[in-house]
């Protein structure tokens, strides 16, 4: 899959976003909340922006960041799949320039799991053709 995505061309990359939210299927996750981390890739042609050096020919990283912040810090959801899906859909709505998006969303501190685990999460890919 990574090879297929690499063939798609240019992309904006946001790594290590951190927000506090109240998502999860366990009641304590909804009342206590926890940290969520994200990586986001947004595919688009960056050739014109690379030549013009003009933000109008690209998409602002801040706009993508704000979508992720709004969703993660917003209304509580039961599933990470839903949270990641909302981020992907709203990111595609930012600009018709964005042709596809990948969202990796994870919980670095998993509530109520009595085991050693680095994180739990989801990774989704959405493009305009399937959205």
From Swiss-Prot:
Keywords: Folate biosynthesis, Lyase. The active site is at residue 107. InterPro entries: Dihydroneopterin_aldolase, FolB_dom, GTP-CH-I_C/QueF. Substrate binds at residues 29, 61, 80-81. The keyword Transcription does not apply. Pfam families: FolB. It catalyses: 7,8-dihydroneopterin = 6-hydroxymethyl-7,8-dihydropterin + glycolaldehyde. Catalyzes the conversion of 7,8-dihydroneopterin into 6-hydroxymethyl-7,8-dihydropterin, a biosynthetic precursor of the vitamin tetrahydrofolate. Can use L-threo-dihydroneopterin and D-erythro-dihydroneopterin as substrates for the formation of 6-hydroxymethyldihydropterin, but it can also catalyze the epimerization of carbon 2' of dihydroneopterin and dihydromonapterin. Homooctamer. Forms a hollow cylinder assembled from two ring-shaped tetramers. Belongs to the DHNA family. This is Dihydroneopterin aldolase 2. It comes from Arabidopsis thaliana (Mouse-ear cress).
